[in-house]
Structures are given as structure tokens and as C-alpha cells.
Design a protein with these regions (language model features):
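A broad helix-preferring feature
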Residues: 14-21, 159-163, 211
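Cleavable N-terminal export/targeting peptides
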Residues: 1-28, 219-222
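Predominantly the C-terminal beta-signal and adjacent terminal strand-loop region
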Residues: 87, 171-222
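Hydrophobic alpha-helical segments of small multi-pass membrane proteins
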Residues: 107-109, 125-131, 155-166, 180-182
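N-terminal targeting signals for Sec/Tat export/insertion, comprising classic cleavable signal peptides
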Residues: 33-67
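Gram-negative (and chloroplast) outer-membrane scaffold detector with strong preference
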Residues: 25-29, 36-44, 67-143, 205-222
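Hydrophobic alpha-helix-in-membranes signature
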Residues: 20, 29, 119-122, 157, ...
Length: 222
């Protein structure tokens, strides 16, 4: 949260400096965007080898996002977005060390609303629906077990995300934005172990991210 406060402060300060006579706002019409993010998955519950109620802890990760959008005249923006996230498992039940990598590859259709106040700084909120592919790999295992049971695997579930942030129109064609996201899946993910009869089930995926992005608008004046 400290990182988000710093980014929002910088963006707001830049908006005050940019709020000159032109008072730039983003152009209407199509745009491209790309961003880089910090990702932190909170503790997630799962069932391992028939034992329910096990919690998993995760190290901080990162994310990438890119896509195309359209800015409508009444504050609505619609987007088609691809995003990818990477995180690393740390422990189960805060005590047992684990090793392995989790990847989230997602395609989302987003709808967002810009609160426009004749200012280059614009708050926005929105959300999206799509598909999440969750993949575990790099020998997802207990590293102290010899030989280990490997839980590598992947599957796809419907996904959702909520978004809130601020954007700064540097010019009508270029804007930068910072936003916070909560993202998850409908349903659970299951991973079969390399040893018959062993598996991880009922993994409920949800994560939190902070993204900084750049938008390029192809339209003229707003």
C-alpha cells in the first residue's frame, strides 16, 4: 500500500504541474495501452492429498498487461486486455517450505468509467470478465522431500477483476495511469501429483496488483 500511495502522490503532483491553460484531456476514440505491475497473492486455501483447510503463502511477483481500448464521449471506456502474472510459492500453513512458480495468463473484456472534471487528472473505476489460465511449474513441490511429489499442471477457469485508479493526460494522445486491481477466478483449480493418488485441489485463485501503464490515443482533440 505504501507503493500505491507514493505513485498516486506523484501522479497527482504531475497533474497539478500539467494543469496549465491547455488543460489536456485524453482524446476520444481507439487507443493502445501497456503496463507493468507489482503483484501480491494473499494467503489462499486449498486441499492437499485429501486434507482440507491448508493455507498457502506466496512471495511478491510481477505482472504485465497490454491491449486495445475505445474511449466513448460520455466517460465510458471499453478494453480487450491480455495480462500475465508470475508469483512464487513460499510456505504452506506459514511453516512448511515449498518451492515452485505460478503463472496467470488472462484475457479480459473490461468496462471502465472516467470521472472527468475538466482536468488532466481523471479518476476511474471499472471491472472485467474473461478467462484465467493458472499454471504451476518449475517442479512445484516440498523441496525437503526426497523424492518429491511434483504438482505441476494447468487449467482454465472464468475470471473477473475490479479496477480503480487515476490517469494523467500528458497530451490528448498520451496518458499515464496507476491503478489497483483485485483479480480472481470463478471456481477452483486442481493439480494432480506425480505420485498416483496425491493431488492439490480446491485452490481458490485471487490476487492483488498495482499497475502503471501508458495509453496512446489515435483520435484528435477530446
Amino acid at each position: 500500500m505504501r507503493t500505491l500511495q507514493i505513485l498516486v502522490g506523484l501522479l497527482a503532483g504531475a497533474g497539478l504541474l500539467a494543469a496549465g491553460p491547455a488543460r489536456a484531456q485524453s482524446a476520444l476514440g481507439p487507443y493502445l495501452f501497456a503496463g507493468l505491475g507489482y503483484d501480491q497473492m494473499p494467503d489462499r486455501n486449498l486441499t492437499i492429498n485429501g486434507r482440507p483447510g491448508v493455507s498457502s503463502q506466496w512471495k511478491p511477483g510481477y505482472g504485465l498487461a497490454a491491449g486495445v481500448g475505445y474511449k466513448w464521449f460520455f466517460g465510458l471506456r471499453t478494453e480487450a486486455e491480455y495480462s500475465g502474472r508470475v508469483s512464487w510459492v513460499k510456505t504452506f500453513n506459514n511453516t512448511n517450505p515449498w518451492a515452485g512458480t505460478a503463472w496467470d495468463n488472462s484475457v479480459m473484456m473490461n468496462a471502465l468509467y472516467d470521472f472527468e472534471f475538466d482536468s488532466p487528472v481523471t479518476p476511474f473505476i471499472g471491472g472485467g470478465l474473461g478467462l484465467n489460465q493458472i499454471q504451476w511449474g518449475n517442479n512445484f513441490r516440498v523441496p525437503t522431500q526426497n523424492p518429491p511429489t511434483i504438482y505441476d499442471g494447468e487449467s482454465i477457469r472464468p475470471g473477473w477483476q475490479g479496477i480503480a485508479g487515476l490517469s494523467l493526460a500528458v497530451t490528448p494522445q498520451i496518458a499515464v495511469a496507476v491503478d489497483g486491481r483485485v483479480k480472481g477466478s470463478f471456481g477452483h483449480f486442481n493439480f494432480a501429483g506425480s505420485v498416483p493418488g496425491k493431488s492439490i485441489n480446491q485452490f481458490n485463485y485471487e490476487t492483488r496488483s498495482i499497475f502503471v501503464s501508458v495509453r496512446y490515443f489515435f483520435g484528435g482533440q477530446p
